């Protein structure tokens, strides 16, 4: 009976969780064999029949056999191989003519493959880059048999380590060969011209001149050679080219190309760069404390996921608005946009099998999945508006549909005031002393305020006098004179009885070096012993930090500590330029003994 009642309660709990969920489980196939990420998912009405399909740039198991898949419902409708791993997929309108069927763009390697009605329409290739002159000269020598393959390999490895420009594909393949295969490779390819080709790292779309959903859009490409390219949607020519300090990995755009637009690029150096129309270089820079794993624009806020398991919100000018800590590592991110309710939120797939939905820093919903989610896509699928499509780390496919009655509220599924609001505070009772002090403040409030102001003015006066005295007697670790702009910083290391005292002396001048300085230590000789209490300072070059080290021996076995004064003087002068008081720690070594 106990077991039966337990199973009944579990079944009731599962039914109640399903009833309280905002999502309907439409499909789950753990063996769908789809390996991709969010940038390679796109939803579009590819045939103009009102039936939205899912476009997947599939990496294949283990990154082998990349393919372009188009799904209708839970089934794969078409499948075609790709020459290289896909980087991004996007759908866009190329022209205003009827019927207005969107085209599909798939970035793979150095090319963008454009499909219309799922048939190949156009192939755009990135322009070739000029080869490294040294690399070109080496292959010319190999062509004339002036160098052997082993020397060619050594020289190419030297160029790869020192040159800023990467080697060509031909040279990189040659460096991967065994010694026995090199000669045949050189004989086969030495007559070929050296070609250096970059690849596409990310892609998105930008409206051309109208903000409507069915307006013509341009393709925006991020490349491995730290450039952003904007392509014309009809002629596929380069309309604009922008340079970045690093390789872009995520892109977000807003506005129209012909009017005004903002472009945010998250790069491999951990920074986000903001560019505007007619700017060849970034206008703003957002420095992150960790590498970005996703970039989503929600209204006017840039939401960034980082490898520190956190979401950050920034303005387009780089001001941080908020930070939310995640319970696990972020694997993927995408935008959830519910047009019927005007909702925009961020979806984050975590390594612990959760998909969290946030509006700003407020948690709206948590979805638990049987496996970690690696890609997310939300939109119209089939003929259902609000459909969430997820692929898992093991290649599974999950499709959920948002209920029409579902309303996202802050705090997940909790509705109403938080539970802490109903708790009564433990307010202490009013004592006789509290009542007397309150009456005194009411009766003598003016006199108390005047007394406070008088004491405050005296405190400021004493602080100013002490500061002036410190400046006049050089009792500060910063020099205030223009002739010797110095900065002193002292660090004590060790447990005792021998301590290491390191003085960091820096010349803060911009152009003039400093010479002829002395360092003097003043200390209690009954407590401490120094091998050198007075020594000369070498030439101080502007801007460099000079560590000056010495050792301090503690002579007391009672754990007593004192202050050691450090003075920096000009040779031939008795007044110090600057000074520092070092609070020595107690000797733990002697105390333990």
From Swiss-Prot:
Cited SUPFAM superfamilies: Quinoprotein alcohol dehydrogenase-like
MF term (GO), any: smoothened binding
Keywords: Acetylation, Bardet-Biedl syndrome, Cell membrane, Cell projection, Ciliopathy, Cilium, Cilium biogenesis/degradation, Cytoplasm, Cytoskeleton, Disease variant, Intellectual disability, Membrane, Obesity, Olfaction, Protein transport, Sensory transduction, Transport, Vision
InterPro entries (alphabetical): BBS1, BBS1_N, GAE_BBS1, Quinoprotein_ADH-like_sf
Entry-linked Pfam families: BBS1, GAE_BBS1
Listed GO biological process terms: adult behavior; brain morphogenesis; cartilage development; cerebral cortex development; cilium assembly; dendrite development; fat cell differentiation; fertilization
Residues with the N-acetylalanine modification: 2
Subcellular location: Cell projection, Cilium membrane; Cytoplasm; Cytoplasm, Cytoskeleton, Microtubule organizing center, Centrosome, Centriolar satellite
Keyword Cytoplasm appears in the UniProt entry: yes
GO cellular component, one term: BBSome
Disease named in the record: Ciliary dysfunction leads to a broad spectrum of disorders, collectively termed ciliopathies. Overlapping clinical features include retinal degeneration, renal cystic disease, skeletal abnormalities, fibrosis of various organ, and a complex range of anatomical and functional defects of the central and peripheral nervous system. The ciliopathy range of diseases includes Meckel-Gruber syndrome, Bardet-Biedl syndrome, Joubert syndrome, nephronophtisis, Senior-Loken syndrome, and Jeune asphyxiating thoracic dystrophy among others. Bardet-Biedl syndrome 1: A syndrome characterized by usually severe pigmentary retinopathy, early-onset obesity, polydactyly, hypogenitalism, renal malformation and intellectual disability. Secondary features include diabetes mellitus, hypertension and congenital heart disease. Bardet-Biedl syndrome inheritance is autosomal recessive, but three mutated alleles (two at one locus, and a third at a second locus) may be required for clinical manifestation of some forms of the disease.
Function: The BBSome complex is thought to function as a coat complex required for sorting of specific membrane proteins to the primary cilia. The BBSome complex is required for ciliogenesis but is dispensable for centriolar satellite function. This ciliogenic function is mediated in part by the Rab8 GDP/GTP exchange factor, which localizes to the basal body and contacts the BBSome. Rab8(GTP) enters the primary cilium and promotes extension of the ciliary membrane.
Name this polypeptide is given: BBSome complex member BBS1
Species of the source: Homo sapiens (Human)
